[in-house]
Amino acid sequence: APVTPGVAVDLSHIPTDVKIKGFSGEDATPALEGADVVLISAGVARKPGMDRSDLFNVNAGIVKNLVQQIAKTCPQACVGIITNPVNTTVAIAAEVLKKAGVYDKNKLFGVTTLDIIRSNTFVAELKGKSSSDVEVPVIGGHSGVTILPLLSQIPGVSFSEQEVADLTKRIQNAGTEVVEAKAGGGSATLSMGQAAARFGLSLVRAMQGEKGVVECAYVEGDG
């Protein structure tokens, strides 16, 4: 598997205004110093026959360790959790930040953007539209049946009851579709990378003062 510094060198050859640095090792402090946004995608991937909850025992410890380092090094950063099972790893991150006395519910996000881009793709395919013209809000986090696409909220598009049932099931099971298609070779990586980039860039645009930037995410409510 490619190591992080090698991936960083590869990325650094792409002509953008972003400066790329790569870090590796157990101590994430050098990578976290001065960070305004941290996205955590570290963890083991699903294999056929597993669901996201099967990853908990390993991934919970990984997230806990990284968030403890965030609490020490960049406690004011906005933190996006991509590591599955998102609904649980976000809760772990929240407890670690609370214990450190630096928790801000407005700065901790479960990144569920992958469900949104999948929904946009599947709806566009079904209705013969361009995916760039479709935006499906998805709520409930990123754990199987909790994934709830709000299909009734898409302007100018209507669905039969059967279409709603079929689409919802496909969106909820899209991750399994990829895992099975890869036949033991991992889970969704390319589409997840696109989703993570979209969420991260939206966060940065909003932090820079751009108005009207909206993304769905798994967050603590006001209740």
Swiss-Prot record:
<dbReference type="GO" id="GO:0006099">
    <property type="term" value="P:tricarboxylic acid cycle"/>
</dbReference>
<dbReference type="Pfam" id="PF00056">
    <property type="entry name" value="Ldh_1_N"/>
</dbReference>
<feature type="active site" description="Proton acceptor">
    <location>
        <position position="142"/>
    </location>
</feature>
<dbReference type="InterPro" id="IPR036291">
    <property type="entry name" value="NAD(P)-bd_dom_sf"/>
</dbReference>
<comment type="similarity">
    <text>Belongs to the LDH/MDH superfamily. MDH type 1 family.</text>
</comment>
<dbReference type="GO" id="GO:0030060">
    <property type="term" value="F:L-malate dehydrogenase (NAD+) activity"/>
</dbReference>
<feature type="binding site">
    <location>
        <position position="59"/>
    </location>
    <ligand>
        <name>NAD(+)</name>
    </ligand>
</feature>
<feature type="binding site">
    <location>
        <position position="192"/>
    </location>
    <ligand>
        <name>NAD(+)</name>
    </ligand>
</feature>
<dbReference type="InterPro" id="IPR022383">
    <property type="entry name" value="Lactate/malate_DH_C"/>
</dbReference>
<feature type="binding site">
    <location>
        <position position="46"/>
    </location>
    <ligand>
        <name>substrate</name>
    </ligand>
</feature>
<comment type="subunit">
    <text>Homodimer.</text>
</comment>
<feature type="binding site">
    <location>
        <begin position="82"/>
        <end position="84"/>
    </location>
    <ligand>
        <name>NAD(+)</name>
    </ligand>
</feature>
<keyword id="KW-0520">NAD</keyword>
<feature type="binding site">
    <location>
        <position position="52"/>
    </location>
    <ligand>
        <name>substrate</name>
    </ligand>
</feature>
<dbReference type="GO" id="GO:0006108">
    <property type="term" value="P:malate metabolic process"/>
</dbReference>
<dbReference type="GO" id="GO:0005737">
    <property type="term" value="C:cytoplasm"/>
</dbReference>
<dbReference type="InterPro" id="IPR001252">
    <property type="entry name" value="Malate_DH_AS"/>
</dbReference>
<comment type="function">
    <text>Catalyzes the reversible oxidation of malate to oxaloacetate.</text>
</comment>
<dbReference type="Pfam" id="PF02866">
    <property type="entry name" value="Ldh_1_C"/>
</dbReference>
<keyword id="KW-0560">Oxidoreductase</keyword>
<protein>
    <recommendedName>
        <fullName>Malate dehydrogenase</fullName>
        <ecNumber>1.1.1.37</ecNumber>
    </recommendedName>
</protein>
<dbReference type="InterPro" id="IPR010097">
    <property type="entry name" value="Malate_DH_type1"/>
</dbReference>
<dbReference type="InterPro" id="IPR001236">
    <property type="entry name" value="Lactate/malate_DH_N"/>
</dbReference>
<dbReference type="InterPro" id="IPR015955">
    <property type="entry name" value="Lactate_DH/Glyco_Ohase_4_C"/>
</dbReference>
<feature type="binding site">
    <location>
        <position position="84"/>
    </location>
    <ligand>
        <name>substrate</name>
    </ligand>
</feature>
<keyword id="KW-0816">Tricarboxylic acid cycle</keyword>
<feature type="binding site">
    <location>
        <position position="118"/>
    </location>
    <ligand>
        <name>substrate</name>
    </ligand>
</feature>
